[in-house]
Amino acid sequence: GLDFAVTYNGQYILTHDKVLYQNQLPKSTVYNLIRYATKHRREISLGTSTGLVGSNIISMGTSKFGQMVSRIVPKSWAKMVERSFKSLIRRFKPQSMETLKTIMREPVYQVVMVATVGETQAIEEKFPHVKITRSSPYSADIISAGQSKLKGIAHLGEVFGFELSEVMAFGDSENDLEMLSGVGIGVAMGNGEDELKDQATHVTDTNNQNGIAKALSHYGLIHFETENSFTSDDDNFNKVKDFHHLMD
């Protein structure tokens, strides 16, 4: 079986022992994004080969707790939450620009900036050579213009010899929309956004209710027996599953 990770919205793809594809942001772009974030008191994290480093606020927001909170807040509260959020981040001491400049000595594949949806246009106008996508309404994922998760998967296809039509992908956020629309089977998670569900081939259960396992079972790829038990005819799949159960 194939064993790889497509990270940073398709900008850094690796196996357990080698990098298959990497597309770093220009140093000048990263530097100017840091300056912009510092000027506007916006927390920022830089995506390197060792992980997303920089902002503690962003680390909290990308944690399971942060994702849970963002999904249980009613949409009708969006404006109120946005105002409160802007007020909150103004109270934080700006990050050290020197620390961020030290981090950017390494290749940076993605920048994550604390910014509401309403601020997207201003950032895009300031930085026309980047693409902004989102997995949260409170942070912006910034990668090179013209790039995406789908293009990252296409690069994998060139390496391993498969077509996008042969791919099944799962998603729950805005930054998954192009990917789910472009692969053979796009599966929207039950906890995902409505627009994603409208475009998906199939809508499964939530991530907390074995949504991925249920979708794989729906398409006959595994045998989903109970909420906590499923197997596959692929021995490699079963070994990976057993390993994750052990680690959990």
Task: Annotate each language-model stretch with its function.
Residues L2-Y8, K131-S136, G186-G190, T204-T206:
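Short hydrophobic/aromatic-enriched beta-strand-loop microsegments
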Residues G10, A115-E119, G190-D194:
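Short, polar loop motifs at secondary-structure junctions
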Residues L14-D17, M104-P107, S135-S136, S181, ...:
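Short glycine-enriched loop/turn motifs at secondary-structure junctions
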Residues L25, V112, T204:
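Catalytic cores of large soluble enzymes that bind and process phosphate-bearing ligands
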Residues Y36, R42, G47-F170:
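Conserved acidic, metal-coordinating active-site core of Asp-based
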